[in-house]
Each structure stands twice: as C-alpha cells, then as structure tokens.
Amino acid sequence: MLAVHFGAGNIGRGFIGSLLSQSRYNVVFVDVNEKIVQALQQKGQYEVIIAGETTQTQVVRNVSALHSQHQQNEIIDQIARADLVTTAVGPNILPLISQTIAEGLKKRLTDRPVHIIACENMIGGSEHLKTYVWEHLSEQEQTSLEDKCGFLNCAVDRIVPNQTHEDPLTVVVEPFFEWVIETKEVIGNIPHIIGAHFVDDLQPYIERKLFTVNTGHALVAYLGYRKKYETIRQAMEDQDILADVTNALRESGRVLVHQYGWNEAEHQAYIEKIVQRFINPSMTDEVTRVARSPIRKLGPNDRLIRPAMKYYECFGEVPASLAKGIAALLLFDYEGDAEAVQLQQTIKESGVEGALEKYAKLPSNHPIVVEVKKQMLYM
C-alpha cells in the first residue's frame, strides 16, 4: 500500500507518518525543506522517541521523500498510484498543494478508490481541501472522480513540541495520541490505519478536543505568561494555575456533557488525562509558542470564546474560569508575536470592549465582556 503525505515536519513524521508506516504503508513524504527531504531520501527511516514515564524508541521504516518545488512530476505520479493521501501542513498551505493533488487525481487510471485526509488543526479540513482541489478540475473530471476519491474529515491530537536533534529526522512525541476519522465519505472499505478511530459523526470529538486540549493548553500558556513562566510544565507546577485550568475544563466539560451526552465520569477522566499530558516532564514546550496567535485564538469559534459562549447559552451563567483565561489572553503582550502586538494596539485604541467586539464578535454589554473586564483588574 502507498501513502503520500504532505508535510514532513514534526507532526508529519512523529504522528501521521509513524502510524501509516506501522500500518504497512510505504510512505512518501512531500516537503519544501531540502535538508529533511534529502535525509529521508538517503536513510529511508527515522526514529520517533516516545517520552512518557519511560522512554521508547520507534524506528519508522519504508519512508522516502520528494521535494514539493523541484519534483512536481514525481509527486503527481505517486498520487496517481496512492491508496491514501494525507496532509499536515497547516490550514493556510492547503490551497497551495491543491493543484498538485488535482493533477495526481487526474492521472489515476484505476477505479481503485483513494482516500484523502487533511490532518490539520481546523474543523472540516478535508472538506476545505476538496473545495480547493475541485477548483482545478473540470465538471467532467469532478464527476469522474466523485465516486473514486473520498475526502475524510478528521480530528488529530498529539503534543509535539519544538525541538532540535543531531539527526534532523529524529522527533520526540508524547505517548498519548488521538486520530479520529469520520466515515461519511468513505468509498468502499475503510482505510487500514492502526491506531485511528473511525466514527460516523466527528463533531462531538472535534469539540471535545477543542474545548479540552486546546482550551486547557491556551489557559496554561496565557496564565503562565502573566506569572513569567517560560515553559508549560513550570506553569502547571503553580497550584493556582492548575486550579484555574481544571476549573475551566470543568466548565467546558459541562457544556460537552450537556450538548453531546458524554458520560460525565468518563469525561472527567478525559480531563484528568489531558491535565497529566500538560505536566509530562519530557514535553518541554515554551509558553510563548503555545500562546502565539492570540487574535486567531480569540475568534468566536475558537478555544476560549466558543466554550464560554456555549456555557452562557446553555446555563445562563458566565463561566468565571474561562473568563479569566480570556482576560489573560487580552494581557498577552509578547513583542515577538505579531498578533500580540496588533491585539495590544487594538486594546489601546478601542479598549477591551472594542477588541472583544472586533475579534470575538461579543457586544460590549455582554455579561462575558463584563466578567472578563472584572477579571483583568485582578491580574
């Protein structure tokens, strides 16, 4: 079996590529990083270090690589033969790789289906990718490929911090991972992927991850920044921050249990597992890296505003701990982050109310805005 994977970064190698190799795919990575591409071409394997209570080393074999700018024809040929095409490139890059994928699909001479899975930190990633790919196909080509190409939405979760090693291919990952794939668009048989979880409806899993992993990680980062901690682990050793994060995840968890019928005890166990992941001593992640892009994270459908709004809609109360996280985000003034600089400028010109109205789409008189402003007074 053949898988073409766009993105040979840490997530691509340490998560997606690793599982595909374990599932007996020959994995062809596609990337723009010449150093990584050459190393994969020369070695044909790399090491993934799983850092938990004990450390395990996994050798990922049967891999190769192609350069996304210099080897377009070869990439197209591989897509034409592939059983699976996956991505881990970032949402903004999906439009840039869509034409290459379209050209590969056009060259397919077989009726054998191909599944395409965008493993991005976004809702409906594969749906979006299909829209971009379809823009490069005629109506006749679209019709011909519709019953041969399944674009499967998914949710992915594994913490892979920034890192450097003597061998540029080596990557350290946490033991926990979750790859949930929706089956609605499967054509023929469900793809064979060891460790993946296939479900009929992805939405509950997307929101569970967003409201727990992403919400919790952001809270640790913004609260940790206020107290001048450098790493996520240092911040989690602060009992006040630990309490704030745990309380916020109980608030977001209450929404999930109410909305999707998750078992309350099971969801509490999930929260505890997520908190333990943040404490993992082997996963050293910088506070400023996790806190980056605060304007995006202040969006109405993102990790802080969405659970806070849902809580208010469901229960008619303002979630105090989530509001505290939003307050900490608004105080994130790290000069090395362009969005943080822009956010502080907006607050300076339009006030907290103006910033929340502009980026979070919250009216200035909303009870959440009132609570956030109150929380900021004590930080």
Swiss-Prot record:
Q: Which GO terms describe its cellular component?
A: cytosol
Question: What positions does the entry give for NAD(+) binding?
Answer: A3, V4, H5, F6, G7, A8, G9, N10, I11, G12, R13, G14
Report whether NAD shows up as a keyword of the record: yes
Q: Which residues form a coiled coil?
A: none
Q: What's the superkingdom here?
A: Bacteria
User: By its UniProt entry, which InterPro entries does this protein fall under?
Assistant: 6-PGluconate_DH-like_C_sf (IPR008927), 6PGD_dom2 (IPR013328), Mannitol_1_phos_5_DH (IPR023028), Mannitol_DH (IPR000669), Mannitol_DH_C (IPR013118), Mannitol_DH_N (IPR013131), NAD(P)-bd_dom_sf (IPR036291)
Q: What is this protein called?
A: Mannitol-1-phosphate 5-dehydrogenase
Q: What taxonomic lineage is listed for the species of origin?
A: Bacteria, Bacillati, Bacillota, Bacilli, Bacillales
Q: Which gene encodes it?
A: mtlD
